[in-house]
Amino acid sequence: MEQKPPDVIVVGPEWPERALLRAQLIEEGYEVVAVDQWPIPRPYRRPGMKPRVLLIDLRELPTPRETLDEVRFVLPTERVLVITALGSLTAEEVKRLGFHFIERPVSIGEIVGATGALLSRLR
């Protein structure tokens, strides 16, 4: 059976939130892979296996700016949704870098809704 790329890869340091996001996105009908840190696993960085959307939470990332600079080499910015966090990059900084963003405080439902909207625009 041929492996296909996931619709979404969730990158988030906190397993409860990551697990809830993954579960809700799966419930919405998406193929989802969830990981706790950047970079994403090598197989998902290969051509033909990259996710349609990368959802990345900046909370607790040691170097958020450098991480987003690396992300730009893997996926086009229009396919990335960044969850901003207090003490990391501001929403304006993320926007200037060309990424979609959603600001904390935010609910799981709001993140799932924003992810679904982005996936719909990319069809």
Label the model's feature ranges:
Residues 39-42, 50-77, 87-90:
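Conserved phosphotransfer microenvironments
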Residues 81-88, 95-119:
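Output/docking surface of receiver
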Residues 1-28, 42-52, 69-73, 107-123:
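Non-catalytic signal-transmission and effector/linker regions of two-component phosphorelay proteins
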Residues 32:
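Short beta-strand element of Class I
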Residues 16, 20, 66, 89, ...:
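Short Gly/charged-rich anion-binding patches and loops
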Residues 28, 76, 95-98:
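Short, structured coil segments at secondary-structure junctions
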Residues 11-14, 36-38, 56-61, 83-86, ...:
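Structural motif
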Residues 7, 79-80:
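Short active-site oxyanion
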